């Protein structure tokens, strides 16, 4: 791989100090621009050549033979900040100096956060995470892992529920799966082994929503209550669902006047949506309802992000400002019929909806000062029945439908980041992202969740299935290892051949071949010559 600059930045080392172009003199503005005081650069006739405008002495060709690595480190860092992950990886292959700058650049943390949020590490492994592994290593591993959803998989089927499963939740950081449904029992499963860990007592009504983090587990019932479990320090599986522990960790929140259909958590709040046409926001410290967002129809789904919250009510989608309890934007009739499901990217800028018409839509939330607008980006029709559930983990959007199928949609090409302008831009490509359909259910699928290399779903059959893609992950790792070994062997043979040629005084045969057949237009002319000799080329 090689790094190509469209406009080569050249400056003389001996002029840089005289002109004041030093690391300590650089100032980075609020808009991301770099201010270079006391120096004005003008462009000479030679393309890409930058010369101080006040300089009286012309620079010689020898002085102008510098490269980008001769720029101040702060300026190079700002240039690297304008690159995407692929480009930043290419830069790290140019030289040892650029490899160090690119590998340690702070942009890798931002790349990771934009796609998956900051990592939540559970257990003893959380100590020393930043010291042991760089953000680049974490990003590369997560990006590599996300590609395995197109590979082989195995299916674990979990039995235990006696009736339909209405909701599933995957807590990947603790390797736990929570499920519940018409039998009113919340069950906890081991994600790795697929074994039942614990089950709660019957809660008295259908459980239609679950949400959890490492501190709190909440379940929403059709009787309008939120049943909560606090985690216990030192307990391997976090939550005491059975009530065997001496410490009391269970309690209920009351306030809704109808069945609870959706739940979500953040660091400070609990969000609950209900058929009473409201979304309630509960403070996690006092466990009191602090805000209520009123809708015009039943609430089916919600997705909070920082100070905003997206919700579906009837066929409409709302974007709320939580602090003022007012809607920033409304998408009327997002789907034909009810809009059942909702998912959101970690940046909060992209929204995914699924509806009764079997369609899935992707919207971008754009903010211009105090104004907020929502723009349709793309849409798909992968299902023949209503889309009851959506789950998103970059770059995969996973949907569960009444037709008994799961659809995997890669939205990578639709999420392009222009870091230099600190804004989002949407790819103009009209080609739909690749899809993968997962079959195996003969009836309705009501809920799905995705995390790392697992997809968990539940439906009318009363079973829970875990689609395990670790097999594809191991195959891909072995393939990469073999490719690396082959490349290393080729390079070793190449070096040995060069050493032998140098000892014998013979020219390098590969260099001669490259000189005779350069990788440029010469190859095209040879191809056209063959084409003229053999007549018209076939289409």
From Swiss-Prot:
WD repeat boundaries on the chain: 160-199, 201-239, 255-292, 294-330, 334-373, 382-419, 433-477
Keywords tagged on the record: Repeat, WD repeat
Entry annotated with the keyword Repeat: yes
GO cellular component, one term: nucleus
Top-level taxon of the source organism: Eukaryota
Entry-linked SUPFAM superfamilies: F-box domain (SSF81383), WD40 repeat-like (SSF50978)
Composition bias type Basic residues, residue spans: 526-539
Pfam families for this protein: F-box-like, WD40
Protein name listed in UniProt: F-box/WD-40 repeat-containing protein At5g21040
Species the sequence originates in: Arabidopsis thaliana (Mouse-ear cress)
